[in-house]
């Protein structure tokens, strides 16, 4: 199944953070924080203004992005956890 985001939403796959401390202690999944970085998998066409114009999303597929810990809506597609996030919830593009 494929997702096509609407309006100013993007589909993001979380990037796994390192699950070890600097001293080599492995952090179990239950104690690990959700990563706040991800890769953009799909981009919606943009937000419609009051006069009917479309403002395109300023992201592209493949961008690595930063977002808030609780941003977006989680969805499971083909066994993979993805996020549907509004463009305004994305804090920065990692370059």
From Swiss-Prot:
SMART domains: Cpn10. HAMAP family: CH10. Keywords: Chaperone, Cytoplasm. The keyword Zinc does not apply. This is Co-chaperonin GroES. InterPro entries: Chaperonin_GroES, Chaperonin_GroES_sf, Chaprnonin_Cpn10_CS, GroES-like_sf. It is found in: Cytoplasm. The gene is groES. It comes from the Bacteria. Transmembrane segments: none annotated. Belongs to the GroES chaperonin family. One of its GO terms (molecular function) is metal ion binding. Disulfide bonds: none annotated. One of its GO terms (cellular component) is cytoplasm. GO terms for biological process: chaperone cofactor-dependent protein refolding. The lineage of its organism: Bacteria, Pseudomonadati, Pseudomonadota, Betaproteobacteria, Burkholderiales.
